[in-house]
Amino acid sequence: MSLEKVEWDYIILGAGTAGCVLANRLSAVKNNRVLLLEAGYSDRSIKIKVPALQPYVFGKKEFDWCYQAQPDKTRNNVRSIWPAGKVWGGGSSLNGMIYIRGQKDDFNEWKNFGVDGWNFEDVLKYFLKSENNEETNSNYHSQNGPLNISNLKSNHLLNEAFIDASANFGLPKNNDFNGISQTGVGKVQAFQKKGLRQNTSSAFLKPIIKRANLKVISGVLINKLIIKDSKVIGINIIDKNISKNFISKGEVILSAGSIGSPMILQRSGIGDASLLKKNDIKVEVNNKAVGENLQDHPGVYCEYPVNISTYNTEFKFNKIVKHGLNWLFNGSGPISTPAATCCAFFNTNKILDRPNAQVHFSPFSYHYSPLSKFHLPDYPAILTGTCILNPETKGRVNISSKDPQRPPIIEHSLWASEKDLTNMVKALKKLSQIMSSKPISKYILNNPTSKLNDIQIKDFIKSNSFLGYHASGTCCMGDKGVLNSNLKVKSIKNLRVIDASVMPKIIRGNTNATVIMIAEKGADYILRKR
């Protein structure tokens, strides 16, 4: 039978971080016929699998949509690139592999937006459901899930120096940012298994790819939903310039991410009526919240040249063979290193209060932006990336045309909020004090912000900013949002959104683990028909 004639129980749009989880859980019921559609292709590339090659994946159109935003007036009209996975595993195939869940109160506060059933006690079991933690099994961790989480497979003395300097500055040492408290400094855990990236494709999709009731189609462009009498009955795609329809007798689940999901809704007639009419699209549901509430963590890089060897010098040709063999046979060494080896979480006003800043620490430095080639300096250096965790700044995503091949209009100014900018100034001043503390200070040759006043630090911020690459919130749950608390699109039957876009407020930390949790909880809602 032609796939276009099959009546699918579930059609999942996007084989990304959430989509792979959903495909696994929904197809576990043998009577469910599940169709998974993806614009990209398999994640078989070695660039995805090898942690040290992550910069060669990020921002590459083979794997990444590379959406470009409108000029940012707060940064001299820079046009930021908003990465979004275009490959099996989505963002989990591109990201820095850092396993952070956020803070307990992040989820408890979602209730303030009219969201029920998502407090920390509600979501913890779904974090545990996916997790297979190599190192710990406690009330906060599990060793029974498909997703492997591991400690670092490589250490560098600068890791310990950073941790000790932070402790001397006043931060407690923290061996588990996903346990009792996030506050403090310590080494990260990573989405890795045997020194390889562990994305949701390798953990959830590939092990079940041969299930008879699951069909995965790659390389297709999602155009729009087919809606009749306020009910989704199918999906229209473009496959090699040919329009095709797939029929749904159950639910369609949007898992196209915080840029892709609102665009599909808008092209389908769900969104701000004025935008839809402007683009000659029939209005199915007038909801101005679609595409609004775009959030990310604004960040700033600082590079510190040092007087000892870092991975910059270890990756030179005379040493890379040794490290390559170590990784190949042991899954360890510098090649297994995630994007950061340590993190520090603190409050920019009172250091031990609820963290609103996160420092990513790496015993290597690199020069990179999504539009430029990755460059690893040949001198030894440290790189830190400091993010504001509770940003006030919000943007939006809108379609530029009903043509699915046209890019979106992304409006987001990284430093539109003076409070965010002030918090970053405070965060960098605290970081500068940490890097001036023993024992790490004896290795630092230049501390870039130590002699700058607040005005100069603001200029430094605007010249060294980056997106946290944690786009969230554009199809959010809540009273004023797009979805109800069960992830169903309001005023339309048989349609849910399950990805990072559902968060009413971005969590305080890296978002990948939370998206996997959302997918686990969403799958449970679907299977229980809630």
Task: Give the location of each predicted region.
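Glycine-rich loop(s) and the adjacent beta-strand/alpha-helix scaffold that form part
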Residues: V29, R33, G40-S45, L225, ...
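Loop/turn elements at helix/coil->beta-strand transitions in domains of secreted/extracellular proteins
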Residues: E7, V29-V34, N119-F120, A212-K215, ...
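Conserved redox-cofactor binding core of oxidoreductases
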Residues: K111-V232, I238, Y301-G324
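Residue-level detector of alpha-helix initiation sites
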Residues: I12, G16-V21, K153, S258-I259, ...
